[in-house]
């Protein structure tokens, strides 16, 4: 796959995510070098990588802090050193094979994962009541299990 095709696929994924949540962002989607995004989220909010998986070759990451504030990060295909942040929220909860959080517009992002790492991202739009299957992938893993930290 050439760079133009890879970039167009990434733009399509970001467009789908943004279209699915038309009211969640007050400003633009933030993209920067991976290390800079992770450092900024850690320094500003105490967020660490808690969960991650692969979608069509792109890395999808959820960072979370101990108070449940979270961010959704997407790595553009062919640009492994870049993250984009299209969605943030609070009240990140991890249950058996399900993780979910409330976006800042009151909508809900849910990730359902199978024991073999296959996963599905679902978005419930608070304003429309619409439920969208955003994307699916493989290799989902919990880096930090907050239930074990609290026990």
Predicted features and spans:
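Positively charged n-region of N-terminal signal peptides that target proteins for export
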Residues: 1-6
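Bacterial N-terminal signal peptides
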Residues: 9-19
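Polybasic/polar functional segments that serve as interface/processing modules
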Residues: 23-151
